[in-house]
Amino acid sequence: METNIIELSQSLKISQKQIEKVLELTAEGNTIPFIARYRKEMTGNLDEVEIKAILDLDKSLTNLRERKATVLAKIEEKGKLTEKLRAAIEAAEKLADVEELYLPYKEKRRTKATIAREAGLFPLARLILQNAATLQEEATALTNETFPTAEAALAGAVDILVEAISEDVQLRAWTYHEMLTNSSIVSTLKDQDLDEKQVFQIYYDFSEKIADMQGYRTLALNRGEKLGVLKVSFENNVDKIIRFFEVRFKVKNDYIHEAIQQAVKKKIIPAMERRIRAELTETAEDGAIQLFSDNLRNLLLIAPLKGRVVLGFDPAFRTGAKLAVVDATGKMLTTQVIYPVPPAKAAQIEASKQDLSDLIDQFGVEIIAIGNGTASRESEAFVAEVLKTHPNVSYVIVNESGASVYSASELARHEFPDLTVEKRSAISIARRLQDPLAELVKIDPKSIGVGQYQHDVSQKKLSESLDFVVDTVVNQVGVNINTASPSLLSHVAGLNKTISENIVKYREEEGMIRSRDAIKKVPRLGAKAFEQAAGFLRIPESDNVLDNTGVHPESYPAVEKLFQMLAITDLDQAAQEKLQSLDVKKVAADLDLGEATLKDIIADLLKPGRDMRDSFDAPVLRQDVLDIKDLQIGQKLEGVVRNVVDFGAFVDIGIHEDGLIHISKLSNSYVKHPSQVVSVGDLVTVWVDKLDIEREKVNLSLVAPRESN
């Protein structure tokens, strides 16, 4: 463990003391959100991402150390472990390097070289290396039933040399670094019929130095190859590699030359190509997962539209649009099916206008949330037409990715057992606008669709990363224990699926939970679960104002003492002024609290019941529909960032297809990655840069035309 702590500290640039505390707190059963929020003094104010990085790297280093121990033991069993080899294995920083060092000592399947050694041809292989003048005679003397001629014996000796050369650790390492530096990845078209939409067109004749490969290109090549569209290969300087080997072995005969040719071309280069492809893929996957995670976090933090009556509009052509009205709390008021777009007849469309208008009037609808799937553009035009007679009502295009997944789920069936899948979907679309976080947690994050190549990466790693993001955001925002669904509650630190369901059942049977202390009455919610969860659960109905803040119950006595010190009885303006003027260092010492903890407590007391999402951008409300034909080059528009990818960002500007801001158009200065400039959910001012009306493609710029280079 001590070795891990030193390496963790060096790799993460975090002090050993901080790392020791994180590992100690985790071993005691504390969760990442709890440690980050309520144990700041112990960890030196590390956040959730830093804590997770410590735990992930600790696990990785432990796996590496265990593999080293296994490899060392196996080599020692064979009696071939030297001090030099031991030192090399112990110094290896990657599993791949450990496996390279282990390769010559691994149990092998029966090979040509194995057969040649068993036939006693190893001395002949040594003579070839020594360039002995009597090779033919020596080979003849070693003939046998398996190798009946001198040439056959020499060929067997060459097989031994091929294996020995191909397993030479130093030569393999040199080749690996040579290829990393100078080789290129090449792709060519294999079958255009499998690429009808020409998605992979730029890769039909593609070449890129390995050192310059971008992650999204690696994943695109992998997908194109998997689909049979592309053939992917390497372009290597084979002659340079062979010359290096020949100098190393001081080649003086054709047999050594042949052994090197075979070892390089058939063994070492293919092995290094596999390793490099695997490493490129792993790096690309990690980048894609991180990007998806960042996008998901920003999506979950989009400001909720609280206290609004919303009509969810799930568009469709033939089967009709499904509508659902939900009240300000998200409770379903009614559902309906209308036929607002062709192939519906004109009379049906007119009747649908009246139906929608009646729903708006009857329930006081303030916003219409339109799903962005099939028939979305036509439905948007229909809604905009109806809203001409309802000037106080707006609409928003909502990303409906995953809504169909939710509506067919067991959870949706439990929530709305009497509704069709489509009507459940309309409710989900409406609720996504009211409270994106509460609704999106009901869906597998992978279905939300704010990544790139998410289906081409390790699904286990993706799930772990996205689950961490959801857990982090849910706990940072806090959860109303009296209104939250089991899905939302299950992401609260210390709670699991069973306890979350028990909380909902307890509410249904016993009524509203009116204090944090009452949470302890929930079945299966023990002392540890309470400790971890309590600070993240909000109770607006409680008589104790602290129960609706992020202040943990363990700090209540200190807060009561603080109130006595400041003569505070109510959190009015006078109390807030007193709290703002505190000498934090002195008061923290008086209360036996850490300064970081006291600062958090004061922040909560100044804004009890605050929602951190309120400081983020809210969705753009629209009343008029915009058509791509209305756009002009240089036109200024307002939009919302829908997705961030490696090559740019997609922005909803109110037309059917999102516009693309290429990375080169994000700034006048160099941008390494789009996420440095924009995030999902950001409200942005953009200018139309290029238009392709026929293909319905719009390129945008974040730089005003007069400012661009």
Predicted regions and their residues:
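Long, charged amphipathic helices and adjacent flexible linkers at domain junctions
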Residues: R275-S293, S447-N480, K586-I633
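A glycine-rich phosphate-binding loop feature that marks nucleotide/adenosyl-phosphate handling sites
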Residues: H177-I185, F313-F317, G373-E378, V398-V405, ...
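Long, charge-rich intrinsically disordered scaffolds of nucleic-acid metabolism proteins
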Residues: D97, V396, G402, S407-V477, ...
